[in-house]
Amino acid sequence: MVEPREQFFQDLLSAVDQQMDTVKNDIKDIMKEKTSFMVSFENFIERYDTMEKNIQDLQNKYEEMAANLMTVMTDTKIQLGAIIAQLEILMINGTPLPAKKTTIKEAMPLPSSNTNNDQTSPPASGKTSETPKKNPTNAMFFTRSEWASSKTFREKFLTPEIQAILDEQFANKTGIERLHAEGLYMWRTQFSDEQKKMVKEMMKK
C-alpha cells in the first residue's frame, strides 16, 4: 500500500509532466504561428517592393510623357513661329526667306489669285525666263491639310528629291503624326541657323 506522502509526490510529478507537455505543445503552436507570420510578412514585403517599383515605373513613364509633350509643344511653337515670321516678312517686302539648301535656294512666288496667273509675259530680251526652282519655305504658307492632301501642292513646292526623302523617312507615319514629323523635318533641314534664330527672336516678342 502506497503511503499518502508518496502518493502526493507521484500525483505532483504527474501534474508537472502534464503541465510540461501542455507548455511544449503551446511552444510548438507559437513557433508555427511565428513561422506563418514570418512567411506572411515576407510576402507583404515582397508585394510592397513590387508595388513601390510599379509606382516608380509609372512616375518615370509620366515624366517621360511630360518631357515628350513639352518637346512636341516646343516644336509646334517653333513651327507656328516660322509661319508667322514668314508671313510678316512677306507682308514687309513680299519676299520669303531663301531656303537653306543650295539646290532649292531660289524662291518660287506664291500662287496668285489672278485667274490669268497661268499666262506669263515674255521677258523684254525675248528669251524664255528660267523656271524658278521650288522653295519649301513657301510651303509654310499653307495649312497642314493642304500639305498632306494636295499632290499638286507637294509637286509645286517640293522638289522630287525632298518628296522622296519625306516618303522614305515617314512611310510608317500617318495623319497628324506624319504632318508633324514632315513639318519638323522641313524646319530642321530647310532653314538656316540664322533663319531659325530670327524666328525664335520674333517669338519672344
UniProtKB/Swiss-Prot annotation:
GO biological process entries: symbiont-mediated activation of host autophagy
Residue ranges crossing the lipid bilayer per the database entry: none
Keywords attached to this entry: Activation of host autophagy by virus, Coiled coil, Early protein, Host cytoplasm, Host-virus interaction
Compositional bias ranges of the Polar residues kind: 111-141
Coiled-coil stretches: 10-75
Region (Disordered): 108-141
Annotated compartments: Host cytoplasm
Keyword Coiled coil: yes
Induction info: Expressed in the early phase of the viral replicative cycle.
Gene Ontology, cellular component aspect: host cell cytoplasm
Role of this protein: Induces host endoplasmic reticulum stress and consequently activates autophagy and NF-kappa-B signaling pathway. In turn, may induce autophagy-mediated STING1 degradation and innate immune evasion.
Protein family membership: Belongs to the asfivirus K205R family.
Protein name: Uncharacterized protein K205R
Source organism of this protein record: African swine fever virus (strain Badajoz 1971 Vero-adapted) (Ba71V)
Organism classification: Viruses, Varidnaviria, Bamfordvirae, Nucleocytoviricota, Pokkesviricetes
